[in-house]
Amino acid sequence: MTIEYATQYRTRSLIPPEPGKPYFIEKGMGDRAHLFGDLVTIYAGGEQTENTFNFFTCEGPRGDIIPAHSHADTHEVFYVTQGAVRLFVEDLAGEQYEKLLTSGDFGFVPKNCPHAYRMERHHTQIVGVAAGPGGTFERFFERLGTPTDELTLPAQPFVPEPAKFATVPRENDVRFLPGHEWRTGS
């Protein structure tokens, strides 16, 4: 039996809108959003975990680098289940790191550390977990992007309206860092 909920984010969701309820979601059936060329699927968020962590997947094609950004209150995990991701991270002392993560590899980005990533192979999938004292940012993807019921990548990249970049990131603990340069060579 599948139970659907109406939440503040969408009229139909398999994720209960309040904490304390066990639930199960089949592969790919979480709350989905298209953002640029990617499909992001949320399985658990702040509402279910009392703002202690989130759990989501991000699937996409080989593409451009996701712009440098940081999260003031959120630690982030990158676990690659399929394909390859090049992860760029700068620690709080300014030292930069770059690592190609392939299936089964793990990367950790502490809060306040600038980071970016680029999917290096088509059909790449990242499992993301974020946690921190300020809550979680999983709804950023559907607020900047567009909610979807599709189970596939967008046929055409979804490019947000420029005005959304002024408000949505700030409201979701995402701070873009225009002009940030990676000195790692890739």
Sequence positions of predicted segments:
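A short, N-terminal "cap"/entry segment at the start of jelly-roll beta-barrel domains
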Residues: 1-53, 155, 159-186
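Histidine-centered metal-chelating micro-motifs
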Residues: 65-67, 86, 105-116
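Short acidic-glycine-tyrosine-enriched beta hairpin
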Residues: 24, 48, 52, 91-111
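A glycine-rich, hydrophobic loop/mini-helix early in the fold
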Residues: 36-79, 88
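Ligand-binding loop in jelly-roll beta-barrel domains
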Residues: 103, 111-138
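A short beta-strand-loop-beta hairpin characteristic of the jelly-roll/cupin
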Residues: 72-103
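A hydrophobic, small-residue-rich beta->alpha segment in the mid-to-C-terminal subdomain
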Residues: 138-156
